[in-house]
């Protein structure tokens, strides 16, 4: 039995969970999310909890058991609290600016990068060097933050580029050169 999969998911007040095979819908104060559930997984929806069970002990079912439980829990947390990733921009002349549903980045290239934000994602820029990526879908927030970071990842010599706020960059010593 999966240690993660066997734990029930608590449903807070104000959250509504409905399941019409194979689509699970979670609605809350911040919005609603849909996810397709594998046919090998069975859901038991009660008043204040959701239990995830597997139909058989096949390898595919066992591997999806804990994953499905975690994905559903992330949906519940997303519609109640939401998710956030913080990116920091380091470097001379590197800056970000939010213009509606487009994030404009100046990262030392000959042209600015205009990144269109996916639906359901909001971006807030603080002092042109901190970017807050927020949304209710954890997967989409992480994916969007990773795409923004990929435009100019941090380099190990001076630490210039875009990095996550909690990320630690291992610095390298430069060449010593001939003397």
Swiss-Prot record:
GO terms (BP aspect): cytoplasmic translation
Record Pfam families: Ribosomal_L6
Key word Kinase present: no
SUPFAM superfamilies recorded: Ribosomal protein L6
One cellular component (GO) term of this entry: cytosolic large ribosomal subunit
PROSITE patterns in the record: RIBOSOMAL_L6_1 (PS00525)
Keywords per UniProt: Ribonucleoprotein, Ribosomal protein, RNA-binding, rRNA-binding
Highest taxon of the lineage: Bacteria
GO molecular function, one term: structural constituent of ribosome
Function: This protein binds to the 23S rRNA, and is important in its secondary structure. It is located near the subunit interface in the base of the L7/L12 stalk, and near the tRNA binding site of the peptidyltransferase center.
Known partners and oligomeric status: Part of the 50S ribosomal subunit.
Family: Belongs to the universal ribosomal protein uL6 family.
Entry protein name: Large ribosomal subunit protein uL6
Organism, as annotated: Geobacter metallireducens (strain ATCC 53774 / DSM 7210 / GS-15)
């Amino acid at each position: 039995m999966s240690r993660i999969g066997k734990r029930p998911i608590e449903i807070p007040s104000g959250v509504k969970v409905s399941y019409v095979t194979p689509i699970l819908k979670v609605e809350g104060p911040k919005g609603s999310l849909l996810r397709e559930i594998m046919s090998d997984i069975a859901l038991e929806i009660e008043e204040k909890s959701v239990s995830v069970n597997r139909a058989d002990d096949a390898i595919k079912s066992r591997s999806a058991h804990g994953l499905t439980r975690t994905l559903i829990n992330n949906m519940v947390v997303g519609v109640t609290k939401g998710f956030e990733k913080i990116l920091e921009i380091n470097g001379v002349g590197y800056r970000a600016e939010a213009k509606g549903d487009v994030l404009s980045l100046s990262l030392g290239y000959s042209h600015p990068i205009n990144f269109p934000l996916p639906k359901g994602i909001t971006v807030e820029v603080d002092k042109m060097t901190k970017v807050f990526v927020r949304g209710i879908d954890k997967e989409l927030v992480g994916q969007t933050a990773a795409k923004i970071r990929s435009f100019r990842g941090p380099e190990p010599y001076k630490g210039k580029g875009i990095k996550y706020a909690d990320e630690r960059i291992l610095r390298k010593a430069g060449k010593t050169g001939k003397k």
